[in-house]
């Protein structure tokens, strides 16, 4: 995958580089090579849009967020809250791992199954519920909704 003509490498690829040539990897870190830079929320969301063949306009419609707010997220001007990232996750039908990675990239707390609301959200993600279905379920168990 390319971003600004620079390859974004997976964790597995980086691990292989470390195993095969730790000295070269360490020197690259000193010189600021791109494998040293973590993904940003906009970069990860772009990858997910491509993976799920979804447009930004579809995402706007499904998240019920304003067009300007979504474009500010994609431009890196806005740092979305955990609940906004959840709305995006449900709109894109992400799985739990992709959602957890989105939280990691966005520097938000991971879903934790011992927290009642988080456990409910994980169940909804696992069942691929829509944002509306998730909202209805959360309200039915007296938990804070996403909308």
Predicted feature locations:
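Short, basic-rich loop-to-helix N-cap that marks the start of a DNA-contacting helix
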Residues: 77-91
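Recognition helix of helix-turn-helix/homeodomain-like DNA-binding domains
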Residues: 64-80, 105-107
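Short alpha-helical "recognition helix" segments of helix-turn-helix
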Residues: 55-62
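General nucleic-acid-binding
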Residues: 1-34
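The alpha-helix within a helix-turn-helix
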Residues: 49, 60, 89
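A short, Lys/Arg-rich alpha-helix, primarily the initiator
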Residues: 21-55, 134-146
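Short, charged recognition helix plus adjacent turn
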Residues: 2-15, 100-129
């Amino acid at each position: 995958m390319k971003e600004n003509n620079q390859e974004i490498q997976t964790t597995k690829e980086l691990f292989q580089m470390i195993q095969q040539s730790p000295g070269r990897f360490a020197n690259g870190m000193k010189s600021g090579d791109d494998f040293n830079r973590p993904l940003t929320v906009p970069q990860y969301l772009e990858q997910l849009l491509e993976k799920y063949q979804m447009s930004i306009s579809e995402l706007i419609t499904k998240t019920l967020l304003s067009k300007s707010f979504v474009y500010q997220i994609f431009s890196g001007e806005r740092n979305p809250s955990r609940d906004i990232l959840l709305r995006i996750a449900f709109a894109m039908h992400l799985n739990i791992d992709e959602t957890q990675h989105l939280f990691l990239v966005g520097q938000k707390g991971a879903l934790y199954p011992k927290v009642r609301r988080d456990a409910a959200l994980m169940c909804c993600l696992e069942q691929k519920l829509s944002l509306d279905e998730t909202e209805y379920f959360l309200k039915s168990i007296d938990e804070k909704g996403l909308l």
